Structures are given as C-alpha cells and as structure tokens.
C-alpha cells in the first residue's frame, strides 16, 4: 500500500493485480485495480475495477492494446468532425461578409453559401456514417510501442489542431471557389448559372471534400497513402454510402425539393468530385513534412 501511495504521489497512473483480502486496500486506491476471477477472494473482486475471468496476465496487455485503439479512434472521430465543421463555419462566415459587401441578395435576404437544411444534411448524413465507421477501425499495429500518455494531456494535441484547421480551411476554400466559379455574379465565373445551381455545386463539392477528408484522418498519425488501404474498409465503405445518399438528394425529386437543390450536369459532377479530393493533398503534405502527435 505504501508503494502504491508513493507512485500516486509522483503522478503515475497505477494499476495493480491482487487476489487476497490483504490486497483489497491497494486495489481500491489505485487507478485500475485488477482482481483474479478464479483464484481471487470475494473481497478482492469487490474492491477491484476489473476482473480477469481467466486469471491470465496476458489479458491485461490485450485490454491495454484495445483501449489504446478505442482512444485513438475517439481522437480521429472528434478531429474529423471538427475539421468538416470548421470548413463550413469559415465558409459561411466569409461568404456572408462578401455577400453583404457586394450586395448579393435573393429578394431582401443575403445570398448565403448554404442553407440550414443543407448544413444539417452534412452533419447527419455526410459525417454520420464515416464517424460511426471510425469506431470500427482496428488499432494500428504499432500502438503498443508508444509510451503511456499523460493523464492531463488534451484529447487533441497542438499538431492535431493545426491539421484540423488546415484540412478545414481547404474545405472552406473549395466551397467558396466553386460558388464563385458557377454563380453568374461571381468574380471569376466559369459557368454562368443561377444561385440554385451554384449552391448545389458548392454543396456537392463540400460533401465530397468532407468524405475524402475522412481518409485524411482514417489512419493517423500515418497517411493513408503509405499504409495498407485495404487493411480496414469500414471508413471507405461508409463514405461510399454517404456519397450515394447525397447523389439521391440531388437527383431524387422529393429530396431535391426538400433541400433546395437542382440536378448537376454530368461533366460538372465529375469535375466537382475531382475538386473534392483536393483536400487529400494538404493533408498528405502536413503528415509528410510536419506530422501529427496523437498524444496518447
């Protein structure tokens, strides 16, 4: 018990195994008390946090590996959601300011980059399936080689936040660029369309960019380009499902009317899909030359 108290005083994360009545005080005091399920006394089992049903110490190592994998998936899940939402929030903020400066209006209302219903679609459908798929991703093979993370370390490290804002800023830039290129009142108009078409083009580009962005976060801290893409397909499959549902929202009349969308020309669909994958480039470059600390 004195040894446990000394380790706790040093700020260590302490786990202890025990099976006897005399182990109960220490099992109760440590962060994680582990009791033997077969040989352990009822008092030790009651005082512990975990019970080894097979009395095999190797099970503890397996539990730590799985726990680290779960924590890493939570980090990726949170960072992925922040990245997509940062891009849309920035685009809405900048787009609203520009619409006010240049008096871009629909009737008496400012012309916004996206509608509330379209943003809701992105949060529930575009990000929903990939975010759930992150929980199914297996831990990296080298997850046990990392040192224990500090208890007071944040969930997202500084480098992770930089990665979030870089990829989110790219999503923002893609949305504003497509809106300007397709709207008849834009600065550098390439395809002269009304605001309905331009907004649909921007909506589709952001959706594809956010889905490709899931690949940026899928195997952090490594790039998906240098690791086994086919090792774990939960996230890619979820992205394909979300992409298919988005196509249905654009080309299926009832959904299209609900979300104020119009059909896109096929060549534009291909073009905007290609633009969406541009979010992969800054993500790869950041991981290649700067790197992300997962702060385990």
Please state what every model-predicted region is.
Residues 1-22, 28-29, 74, 108, ...:
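Cytosolic catalytic headpiece
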Residues 204-296:
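C-terminal transmembrane module of polytopic membrane proteins
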Residues 25, 130, 253-254:
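Proline-centered helix-kink/hinge sites
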Residues 1-15, 35-221:
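Membrane-embedded transport module
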Residues 26-28, 45-46:
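Structural signature of FAD isoalloxazine-binding scaffolds in flavoprotein oxidoreductases
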């Amino acid at each position: 018990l004195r040894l446990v108290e000394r380790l706790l005083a040093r700020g260590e994360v302490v786990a202890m195994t025990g099976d006897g009545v005399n182990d109960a005080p220490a099992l109760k005091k440590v962060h994680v008390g582990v009791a033997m399920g077969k040989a352990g006394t009822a008092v030790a089992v009651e005082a512990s946090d975990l019970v080894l049903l097979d009395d095999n110490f190797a099970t503890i190592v397996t539990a730590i590996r799985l726990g680290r994998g779960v924590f890493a998936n939570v980090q990726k899940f949170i960072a992925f959601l922040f990245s997509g939402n940062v891009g849309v929030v920035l685009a809405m903020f900048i787009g609203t300011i520009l619409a006010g400066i240049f008096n871009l209006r629909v009737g008496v209302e400012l012309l916004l980059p996206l509608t509330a219903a379209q943003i809701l679609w992105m949060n529930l459908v575009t990000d929903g399936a990939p975010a759930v798929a992150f929980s199914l991703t297996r831990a990296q093979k080298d997850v046990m080689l990392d040192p224990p993370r500090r208890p007071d370390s944040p969930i997202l490290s500084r480098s992770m936040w930089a990665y979030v804002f870089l990829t989110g800023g790219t999503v923002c830039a893609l949305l504003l660029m497509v809106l300007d290129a397709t709207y008849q009142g834009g600065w550098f108009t390439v395809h002269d369309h009304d605001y309905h078409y331009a907004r649909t083009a921007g909506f589709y580009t952001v959706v594809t960019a956010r889905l490709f962005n899931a690949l940026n976060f899928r195997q952090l801290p490594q790039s998906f380009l240098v690791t086994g893409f086919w090792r774990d397909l939960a996230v890619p499959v979820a992205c394909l499902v979300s992409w298919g549902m988005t196509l249905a929202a654009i080309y299926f009349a009832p959904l299209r009317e609900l979300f104020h969308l119009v059909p896109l020309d096929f060549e534009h669909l291909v073009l905007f899909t290609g633009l969406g994958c541009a979010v992969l480039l800054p993500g790869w470059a950041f991981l290649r030359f700067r790197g992300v600390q997962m702060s385990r």
